[in-house]
């Protein structure tokens, strides 16, 4: 178990101040206008949860002062959901729905704080939606994680170079806490 870093505390304080985890959600749609092998994409998302330790962080129940601890689970065996939004007529209509998903909260203790959903979108776009608690990752890290996931996909689909190993989350966390 580890305490929160300074950056995580900032987001946690917002959650406490506003009484909702909604103020600490971050969501991204990553899609391409091309056919995707959703079986392979699912495999790559599952691999990404192994490679990106932040996706496996859980938070304990708050203590009497509202503070939480964080810990890393070794595996996340959850299935990856799939939504076919291609019949919605336009990307704008699909975006409206996904904007609603972005406001959903992760309520509870010792629960996953990251969720991937594979998507079939209007106008021939396909990809995934990722929704996370911002205490797990910053915006730059989210871009790196999405890039890594697509590199895994292109490695298995097209034989491109295998992506470099990512920084180990627990090692980086310990360094941040030592500052």
Task: Indicate where each model-derived feature is located.
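Short, charged/polar, Gly/Pro-enriched secondary-structure boundary elements
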Residues: 74-82
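Hydrophobic pocket-lining residues within nucleotide cofactor-binding pockets
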Residues: 85
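Acyl-group handoff/entry surfaces in thioester-processing enzymes
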Residues: 1-73, 88-177
